[in-house]
């Protein structure tokens, strides 16, 4: 089949009345889009669009490198990461770089190296972006047919999809190799309060790993967010990487089935909408993961989860009052329930008081005190270790609550500290970004479907107030 790259189609979108402004030689008349429509002007210019994407990647990687070095420059080893407003160093520490037992930072040089590598990479990407945006060929189809494409060429589109899937699969395997062979990763569950270790006994059982996908998202079930051991996380990445690579090969070798050709819209804007929907889902899942999961996001680096801080408070006061002579097994609280300990709906012994709602929390500082029926009274009396007391007291005062002005903790607490948890920032930002990506998906999906149906006209601007106003210039 002859490639269709010469068939230029411009959607008749009506835009602002000032169509004279031209950027990089592409104005509204020749492209059908005004300057503020950004990459829409490049829909049919694959070379220029490549430049825009490479330059965008350069900006992303530059931010990563610069922010990384900024965090290294401001890092104080004596304070926990989550007290310092860090969001990048906790990720590097979770990968096992620069940390030792208990999550203590013993070497910041790997963090410096990471920042420099990202800055160098961003320079390469930035040069490539400028080259392709300004100097390279406008279209790739004639000179480099392998990299050229036509949005309507379904076979080429699924080939590109396949290449992307293979790259994602290789990315998943990078984590696997780091955990298995290159120094290991940080395991918050390692005995005695967490340590870096190599993963030796991968979970590859499909019933276990795909069982997470079949769990309820509610309560103590928690869907995939409930994963709480590294063997499952790394084993899951083996499966994900394999599925992505095999799926990528399949998409490269095959053509779309007839039902897919009929059901999907095959245009650049449609692909944009699909991508935005996927990123939106990723954002919402990441939000839940960083908020609730203390295995993939260890509390040593990100601060405690909300339930963890609450349970830590109950534990701290249980320890204090038990030392003062209270019988924590039988003391009654103001509601008639147990003051320190009570029973869950399913019969386990749990912490009493307001924290009862978080009874299904699992945390490495607390699990050693559980028996077959929940919290074990004899262990609470005899086996509490100093590191558990220290950690729970620390977590109690660093709950992931807080306002934009950084006055953290409970709003009514007179001893509030100048602290906002990275969990708050990361969960909130990913929720907000996930929401806006979803709105972008709806917007572009609607436009793509309308264009495919043949009635895309843009917004009718005949009665727009701006038309009757004096131009600003």
From Swiss-Prot:
GO biological process, one term: photosynthetic electron transport in photosystem II
Residues annotated with N-acetylthreonine modification: 15
Keywords of this entry: Acetylation, Chlorophyll, Chloroplast, Chromophore, Manganese, Membrane, Metal-binding, Phosphoprotein, Photosynthesis, Photosystem II, Plastid, Thylakoid, Transmembrane, Transmembrane helix
PTM-bearing positions, type Phosphothreonine: 15
Protein name: Photosystem II CP43 reaction center protein
One Gene Ontology CC term in the entry: photosystem II
Residues given in the record as [CaMn4O5] cluster binding sites: 367
Function according to Swiss-Prot or TrEMBL: One of the components of the core complex of photosystem II (PSII). It binds chlorophyll and helps catalyze the primary light-induced photochemical processes of PSII. PSII is a light-driven water:plastoquinone oxidoreductase, using light energy to abstract electrons from H(2)O, generating O(2) and a proton gradient subsequently used for ATP formation.
Cofactor note: Binds multiple chlorophylls and provides some of the ligands for the Ca-4Mn-5O cluster of the oxygen-evolving complex. It may also provide a ligand for a Cl- that is required for oxygen evolution. PSII binds additional chlorophylls, carotenoids and specific lipids.
Prosegment location in residue numbers: 1-14
Entry's transmembrane regions: 69-93, 134-155, 178-200, 255-275, 291-312, 447-471
Keyword Cytoplasm: no
Organism, as annotated: Oenothera argillicola (Appalachian evening primrose)
Subcellular location: Plastid, Chloroplast thylakoid membrane
UniProt family annotation: Belongs to the PsbB/PsbC family. PsbC subfamily.
InterPro entries in the cross-refs: PS_antenna-like, PS_II_antenna-like_sf, PSII_PsbC, PSII_PsbC_sf
UniProt topology in membrane: Multi-pass membrane protein
Chief place of localization: plastid
Self-association and partners: PSII is composed of 1 copy each of membrane proteins PsbA, PsbB, PsbC, PsbD, PsbE, PsbF, PsbH, PsbI, PsbJ, PsbK, PsbL, PsbM, PsbT, PsbX, PsbY, PsbZ, Psb30/Ycf12, at least 3 peripheral proteins of the oxygen-evolving complex and a large number of cofactors. It forms dimeric complexes.
UniProt GO MF annotations: chlorophyll binding; electron transporter, transferring electrons within the cyclic electron transport pathway of photosynthesis activity; metal ion binding
């Amino acid at each position: 089949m002859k490639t269709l790259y010469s068939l230029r189609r411009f959607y008749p979108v009506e835009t602002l009345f000032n169509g004279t402004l031209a950027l990089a030689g592409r104005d509204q008349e020749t492209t059908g889009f005004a300057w503020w429509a950004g990459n829409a002007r490049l829909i049919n210019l694959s070379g220029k669009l490549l430049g825009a994407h490479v330059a965008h990647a350069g900006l992303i990687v530059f931010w990563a490198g610069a922010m990384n070095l900024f965090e290294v420059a401001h890092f104080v080893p004596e304070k926990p990461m989550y007290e310092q407003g860090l969001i990048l160093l906790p990720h590097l520490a979770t990968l096992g770089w620069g940390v030792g037992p208990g999550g203590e930072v013993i070497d910041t040089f790997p963090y410096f190296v990471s920042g420099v590598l990202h800055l160098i990479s961003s320079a390469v990407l930035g040069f490539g972006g400028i080259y392709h945006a300004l100097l390279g060929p406008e279209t790739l189809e004639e000179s480099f047919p392998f990299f050229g494409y036509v949005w309507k060429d379904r076979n080429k589109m699924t080939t590109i999809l396949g290449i992307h899937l293979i790259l994602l699969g290789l990315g998943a395997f990078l984590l696997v190799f780091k955990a298995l062979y290159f120094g290991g990763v940080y395991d918050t569950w390692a005995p005695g309060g967490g340590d870096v270790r190599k993963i030796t006994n991968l979970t590859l059982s499909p019933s276990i790993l795909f069982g997470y996908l079949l769990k309820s998202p509610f309560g103590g079930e928690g869907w995939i967010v409930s994963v709480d051991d590294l063997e499952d996380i790394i084993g899951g990445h083996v499966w994900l990487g394999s599925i992505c690579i095999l799926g990528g090969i399949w998409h490269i070798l095959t053509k779309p089935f007839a039902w897919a050709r009929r059901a999907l819209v095959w245009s650049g804007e449609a692909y944009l909408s699909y991508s935005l929907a996927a990123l939106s889902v990723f954002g919402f899942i990441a939000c839940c993961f960083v908020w609730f999961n203390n295995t993939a996001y260890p509390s040593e680096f990100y601060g405690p989860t909300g339930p963890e801080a609450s349970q830590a408070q109950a534990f701290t006061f249980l320890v204090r009052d038990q030392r003062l002579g209270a019988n924590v097994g039988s003391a009654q609280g103001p509601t008639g329930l147990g003051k320190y300990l009570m029973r869950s709906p399913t019969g386990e012994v749990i912490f009493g008081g307001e924290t009862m709602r978080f009874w299904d929390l699992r945390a490495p500082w607390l699990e050693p005190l559980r028996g077959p029926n929940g919290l074990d009274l004899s262990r609470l009396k005899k086996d509490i270790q100093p590191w558990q007391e220290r950690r729970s007291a620390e977590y109690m005062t660093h709950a992931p609550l807080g306002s934009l002005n950084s006055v953290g903790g409970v709003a009514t607490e007179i001893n509030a500290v100048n602290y906002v948890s990275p969990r708050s920032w990361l969960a909130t930002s990913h929720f907000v970004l996930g929401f806006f990506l979803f709105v972008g998906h709806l917007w572009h999906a609607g436009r793509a479907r309308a264009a495919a149906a043949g009635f895309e006209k843009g917004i009718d601007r005949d009665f727009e107030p701006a038309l009757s106003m004096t131009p600003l210039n």
